[in-house]
Amino acid sequence: SFGTAGLRGTLGAGTNRMNVYTVGRATQGFADYLNAHFENPSVAIARDSRNNGELFVRTAAAIFAANGVHAYVYPRISPVPTLSWAVRDLGCSGGVCVTASHNPAAYNGYKAYASDGCQITSEAAAAISAAIESTDIFSGVKSVDFDAALAKGDVTWIDDAVLERYYGAVLSKSVSNLSADEVAKAPLKLVYSPLNGTGLVPVTTVLERAGVTDITVVPEQRDPDGDFPTCPYPNPEIREAMQKG
């Protein structure tokens, strides 16, 4: 069922699983909601490293485009905070992140965000859920070809300037008055693991620009991998997830 956290479930066939049909139906319902509440609506879309993420993003973007909702899409994997930033930075009506957060590898999900970049409210979730329930999963979903929508301009890649503004905003919130050069002189050593997710580039970029350069990244968990081979349950609150670090 669709709630404030959107959808989440195991990958597979069926209406209670994550697949192109359930993603498509959810997107149609979200598009109907956005069209009912905004003039010329738009969305930002991102995905993490989970399996089928790119497929679900292309599916969602094509459906939004078919419904007159302009889709701004991150061309590479991106963590949730960068999606929230893009919604606000680009002035979007909403956002979607294809992610199952810290669930095991068999899962994926579809999180919806409001125009403020925050998770949708219970009222919005109820309205979107009603729109989804009224949509036939096979015949009620409008779609176009993703590449055709991209060529037409109904889908737009999010460029690196958006991420650069995000990095700048994060760095501006530093509680330290030290410059990056001063920080670099301090004996700071840090161990970091992205847990095979999306954090490597944004986390190390911000840390290095802040002056923290002695960063050891756990090699087995450095690269994005939807199978999470060294960390079946990628939740940093679970002790086992941090053992290699």
Region locations from a protein language model:
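An N-terminal, well-structured beta->alpha segment
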Residues: 1-60, 67, 149-190, 198
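N-terminal small/polar loop signature for handling phosphorylated ligands or for N-terminal nucleophile
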Residues: 44-107, 206-245
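Short, glycine-/Ser/Thr-/acidic-enriched flexible segments
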Residues: 7-9, 14-16, 50, 78-79, ...
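Alpha-helix capping at helix-to-loop junctions
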Residues: 36, 89, 134-138
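Residue-level preference for alpha-helix termini and adjacent loops
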Residues: 1, 6, 10, 17, ...
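Gly/Ser/Thr-enriched, mixed-charge loops and adjacent short helices
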Residues: 108-241
